[in-house]
Curated annotation (Swiss-Prot):
NCBIfam families xrefs: infA
Domain (S1-like): residue spans on this chain: 1-72
Gene coding for it: infA
Disulfide bonds: none
PROSITE patterns documented for this protein: S1_IF1_TYPE
InterPro entries: NA-bd_OB-fold, RNA-binding_domain_S1_IF1, S1_domain, TIF_IF1
UniProt lineage: Bacteria, Bacillati, Bacillota, Bacilli, Lactobacillales
UniProt subcellular location: Cytoplasm
Alphabetized Gene3D superfamilies for the sequence: Nucleic acid-binding proteins
Domain of life assignment: Bacteria
UniProt-recorded name of the protein: Translation initiation factor IF-1
Length: 72
């Protein structure tokens, strides 16, 4: 999948799940399941419920995403 195909949207982490998975409520009100990207995992960036994050969504499955940035 090319990098141009992803949809980037902001959201808020609502719940923490096992295996570095999170429930994220997007700006449009949808709740998706998201995992942590490799760069965030590599740099030991902690993500907690209530954090604002940027999520990448695939156009093929809009219910799952990847957290690529945590706002300060």
């Amino acid at each position: 999948m090319a990098k141009d195909d992803v949809i980037e949207i902001e959201g808020k982490v609502t719940d923490t799940l096992p295996n570095a998975m999170f429930k994220v409520e997007l700006e449009n009100g949808a709740v998706i399941l998201a995992h942590v990207s490799g760069k965030i995992r590599k740099n030991y960036i902690k993500i907690l419920p209530g954090d604002r994050v940027t999520v990448e969504l695939s156009p093929y499955d809009l219910t799952k995403g990847r957290i690529t940035y945590r706002f300060k």
